[in-house]
Amino acid sequence: MKLPESFYETIFLFLESGLILGSLGVILLTNIVYSALFLGFVFVCISLLYLLLNADFVAAAQILIYVGAVNVLIIFAVMLINKKQYSNFFVYWTIGDGITLTLCTSIFLLLNNFISNTSWSKIFLMTKPNLVVKDIILINTVRHIGSELLTEFLLPFELMSIILLVALIGAITLARREKKIELEKNDFFNF
């Protein structure tokens, strides 16, 4: 269905503002459960951006993997840990916070510079010089993504699964450790 470009620009504007507000909610809220819910909102906005770009498979994978698995895992881990919340909204900045802010800002600006100065269309056409633009559009994207994941990007794909497994084991370990400490304190006071 062909819609006017202003319609796409309006939806894009709403999605980008949702991304910015959701990201600010993740960073600024002191309640970790609310931050995790805002993170899920950010993931949904990203998947809607993929739908806007006609990347249906990537949008579905974004919803299933990030919202359905990673964000739910984060919420369950946070609820199992059950840490006390900070009552003060404004926490004091330390030197480490300033160093982290400087480092993250410089990495963001460096990546922004590289991304904006790279001609992406030339890179894709240089890697596949015998493809015509009509042939590029007709490539089955799901099959292409699957073959690239299992051939060219097999090692990063497996490393990502190992990182997610370590995060899951770490969340379970933290939840069990908190429970053991509570039980030991209760046993101590019973004597």
Curated annotation (Swiss-Prot):
It catalyses: a plastoquinone + NADH + (n+1) H(+)(in) = a plastoquinol + NAD(+) + n H(+)(out); a plastoquinone + NADPH + (n+1) H(+)(in) = a plastoquinol + NADP(+) + n H(+)(out). It is found in: Plastid, Chloroplast thylakoid membrane. This is NAD(P)H-quinone oxidoreductase subunit 6, chloroplastic. NDH is composed of at least 16 different subunits, 5 of which are encoded in the nucleus. Keywords: Chloroplast, Membrane, NAD, NADP, Plastid, Plastoquinone, Quinone, Thylakoid, Translocase, Transmembrane, Transmembrane helix, Transport. NDH shuttles electrons from NAD(P)H:plastoquinone, via FMN and iron-sulfur (Fe-S) centers, to quinones in the photosynthetic chain and possibly in a chloroplast respiratory chain. The immediate electron acceptor for the enzyme in this species is believed to be plastoquinone. Couples the redox reaction to proton translocation, and thus conserves the redox energy in a proton gradient. GO terms for cellular component: chloroplast thylakoid membrane. InterPro entries: NAD(P)H-Q_Oxidoreduct_6 (IPR050290), NADH_UbQ/plastoQ_OxRdtase_su6 (IPR001457), Nuo/plastoQ_OxRdtase_6_NuoJ (IPR042106). Belongs to the complex I subunit 6 family.
